[in-house]
Amino acid sequence: MEHLFDYVGHFGRFQAYLYFASAFQTISCGIHYLASVFIAVTPKFICRAPGNISTVLLPNASTLRLEDAWESWTSKDYLVVQQENGDIWELNQCSRLKREDASYLTYFYDGNKTLFSCSNGYHYDKSNLESSIVTEWDLVCDREWLAKLIQPIFMLGVLIGAVIFGDIADRVGRRPIIWITSTGQFLFGIAVAFTFDYYSFVIVRFLLAMVSSGYYVVVFVYLTEYVGIKARTWASMHVHAFFAVGVMIVSLVGFLVRTWWIYQIILSLTTLPFVLCCWMLPETPFWLYSQGKYKEVEKLIRTIEKWNKISTPCKLSELCPAQETHVDQPNTLKNHNVLDLFYNWSFARRTITVWLIWFTGSLGYYVFALNSVNLGGNEYLNLFLTGAVEIPSYIVACLGMDKIGRRNTLAPFLIISAVICGVIMLIPQDHSTVTIAMSMAGKFSIAVAFGLIYLYTAELYPTIVRSLAVGSGSMMCRIGSVVAPFCVYLTDVWIFMPQMLVGIMAFLTGILTLTLPETLGIPLTSTMEEAAEMGTTSGITKRKALTESNGVVMEKLDQTTDNAAS
């Protein structure tokens, strides 16, 4: 089927329409993946007094309104409040004390006090945020752990959705799954805003994660099956750029809308335009051909010819001769499992390194993104910048891997990101502008590495286990995204703990990456023996001579990008 693009064009008008229409929907994936940054915000809070407050005392000030005290109050202090009935309370974040003697009002008091729990709820600072799920369901103090599980549970849904929908799409086609998942994104996205308690919120968000991940996986395959080999690298890489646009939209909507359920509805409406037109998308020619639906392939070719203004009709039999079907090939691909990735010590070392790259890339990506709101300065601008720096990073990744090689681009940027993490740890905490700038540089570096690992993994393994290699690497990627929120929560232990963990992982992984063979200009391997020889002078020379004698420049990456998103 690859010859089809030599005839109709590798990225003609028809492909451009499908590409931008389908890639547009990946914006919503970026939105939902990071929406919790502002949905689950914990503002300043303090235990609620049982009645109406008439006076508020701070260590060095007094006011009549609690709203006026938030700016001066810090969590290490308690508030002294006098109620309209004369009772005096000392309010902490997770407890409150009632003074026995209410005859005089002072901040400091050495008399008897009675300890009470926060059974009346909490006061929240609403100066910058009207509501979040934390304020809605009091996810603080002994319920704080529930708030911290929101993003990991979502990422677990991402992992499961990628596995389930990727497999179903191979069985029933890409188009039905695109319909189901994009519609699911809209419906579940809206439903999240109307959940009635924490548990219903988490369940619906989990389902939203599954369909969002399913769409992202399948649309990646869908688009690469419509783009010819000459444009496939750039086209597949820049699907990620649409995801980055979604991250920027999250920051913009979060800045404008401070009520969590309205914020969620507005973000979910970005899905609606695609839902209304996704039924018009055709099935891919690769999947139709693999299912023996040749008449539908012929019909699709006629449509592409019309859109791309191809004047000379061509038959499917001319593009795909019978001898290219390789009827016996599938039987050779069924007997392999993940243990084959540990074929020998050399392969085991290669696989462990590749898995570490996937894990570290995902870990660093989400740590930089999720932690951006903790850097100081304007948290909305910080998140916007983390999305904005991704777009040029993919351009650099494309240029680098085509000019200096995959390994020679990947390893330096991993090491650079590690160095940047170290530099961030040395910056004084009052220099927030410098910290933000270095964090953006770190996000840029890790995004370069994360962007090209899909293709590099496929090139490192032979045809018989290539799907397994990319699929298992993708699984490590999802695990990294589940772990990332917990790393960010370690700022409670030490503010630079996330950067330290990412820095250590990136440095070790970058060094190990240097032990991998370079694949730029090297034909794809078909057997374990050929792949094992990759990187040796004799192996490269022998295989280059073989491909040149057959008049082949490089084996097409037909199934590489299909499995890259699995």
Curated annotation (Swiss-Prot):
Glycans are attached at residues 52, 60, 112, 344. One of its GO terms (biological process) is monoatomic ion transport. One of its GO terms (cellular component) is membrane. CDD domains: MFS_SLC22A16_CT2 (cd17375). The chain crosses the membrane at residues 20-40, 149-169, 176-196, 201-221, 237-257, 261-281, 351-371, 381-401, 408-428, 436-456, 468-488, 493-513. Coiled coil: none annotated. Keywords: Glycoprotein, Ion transport, Membrane, Transmembrane, Transmembrane helix, Transport. InterPro entries: MFS_dom, MFS_sugar_transport-like, MFS_trans_sf. It is a multi-pass membrane protein. GO terms for molecular function: organic cation transmembrane transporter activity. Its main location: membrane. It is found in: Membrane. High affinity carnitine transporter. Belongs to the major facilitator (TC 2.A.1) superfamily. Organic cation transporter (TC 2.A.1.19) family. This is Solute carrier family 22 member 16.
